[in-house]
Amino acid sequence: MSKPLLDKTLFKKTLDVVGVRVEAKKIGRVVKKLHGHLLNLPRLRNVVPDPTNPDPYKNSSSKLILLNSKVKDMETLQPLNEDLVAFLKEESLAFVSHAIELDYSYFAVDQVLSELLPKGMDIPSSFETVGHIAHLNLRDNQLPFKNVIGQVILDKNAQIRTVVNKTDNIETKFRTFPMEVLAGDDDMEVEVHESKASFRFNYAEVYWNSRLQQEHLRIIRQIKPHDVVCDMMCGIGPFAVPVALNGSKVYANDLNPRSYHYLKENIALNKVEKLVTAYNLDGRDFLAKLLSEKKQFTQVLMNLPAIALEFLDAFPGQFDHWEGELPFVHCYCFSNADDVKQDVKQRAEKIMGGELDPERTSFHLVRDVAPKKVMVCISFQLPESIAFSSERQASKQDDPKRRKVAAENAA
């Protein structure tokens, strides 16, 4: 099968319609009478200058009111009803043939591609937008036509300068993926705006998903200015920077050196240097560093759904020095189980070696990522039985104040 050429002359078409020549002062009344019978096509006006006027684009004495394509005969004006035809003739209005010239620029993406792609092939008219980049995930049968698809999307979206296609799955430890430029500039440096923050980054070097904007906002709204946030897998800062803009202190970490680079750039860009401290460590090492330095935090974010659950093994028995309430943890993961909540809860408990308190555990289904596979956020307050070592738990049991409270409760 040969791939199609983008021949824009294929889309030159003439649309012949009936026009009603009307004096300018009568236009409003006649348009109202013709409601339901007017030309109704995207981006086309149904009241246009009268081409018979010497200078039709200036205030002239007449205009053309264009009827929809069902009205073909200027003599009978069918399917207009008799009363409407009588009204038009009583007004002594003239009926003329009017040609509308259409070309490639008029037609939408799906209309163009439906002409260029084989019959029955899905039209890839939806895509993720990241700054000036359109990101496609083309199917195998669409790949022979990838360049023409890219060119059409580029032509039809004024804000797009680059069209890329993912060529393989996300399999790197930094969650980046291989891509190829289908059309436009080979420019991966983008700037996006989200949650009242600005972010700059190279789309080929870091992970960014515009479809997670609402999920970012959901968590950001939960975090209050008095909170201190430990963001273990922060990327370029979609959580860290906005919560800092809201007044929270943040310890933000990412293993990818390029994410770390852009994280620091975005911290400076948004002027939150005094509130965000950036780290470039493995997530477990980062948590251990904060705990060894006796840093206190109230919220922990773990946004690496492919493996974040595994990092919960860094929590058990590491909080013996802790003062006050233990932090809340928000951990993202994938699940393909029938009972998603039970599956995620059991996996988290198995990794941490203890049970979560049902009263302090909640779940949020973020989005479907594949058939029978969902992205989930489990949120829970870290239980004492997991956070503290057996020695710390034993010492708490022997605490005189705790024994007194227990005795009073038993009385």
Swiss-Prot record:
HAMAP family: TRM5. The keyword S-adenosyl-L-methionine applies. It catalyses: guanosine(37) in tRNA + S-adenosyl-L-methionine = N(1)-methylguanosine(37) in tRNA + S-adenosyl-L-homocysteine + H(+). It comes from Phytophthora infestans (strain T30-4). Belongs to the class I-like SAM-binding methyltransferase superfamily. TRM5/TYW2 family. Its EC number is 2.1.1.228. This is tRNA (guanine(37)-N(1))-methyltransferase. One of its GO terms (cellular component) is mitochondrial matrix. S-adenosyl-L-methionine binds at H216, D254, L255, D282, G283, N303. Monomer. SUPFAM superfamilies: S-adenosyl-L-methionine-dependent methyltransferases (SSF53335). It is found in: Mitochondrion matrix; Nucleus; Cytoplasm. GO terms for biological process: tRNA N1-guanine methylation. Specifically methylates the N1 position of guanosine-37 in various cytoplasmic and mitochondrial tRNAs. Methylation is not dependent on the nature of the nucleoside 5' of the target nucleoside. This is the first step in the biosynthesis of wybutosine (yW), a modified base adjacent to the anticodon of tRNAs and required for accurate decoding. Residues 391-411 are annotated as: Disordered. Keywords: Cytoplasm, Methyltransferase, Mitochondrion, Nucleus, S-adenosyl-L-methionine, Transferase, tRNA processing. The lineage of its organism: Eukaryota, Sar, Stramenopiles, Oomycota, Peronosporales. Coiled coil: none annotated. GO terms for molecular function: tRNA (guanine(37)-N1)-methyltransferase activity. PROSITE patterns: SAM_MT_TRM5_TYW2 (PS51684). The keyword Nucleus applies. It comes from the Eukaryota.
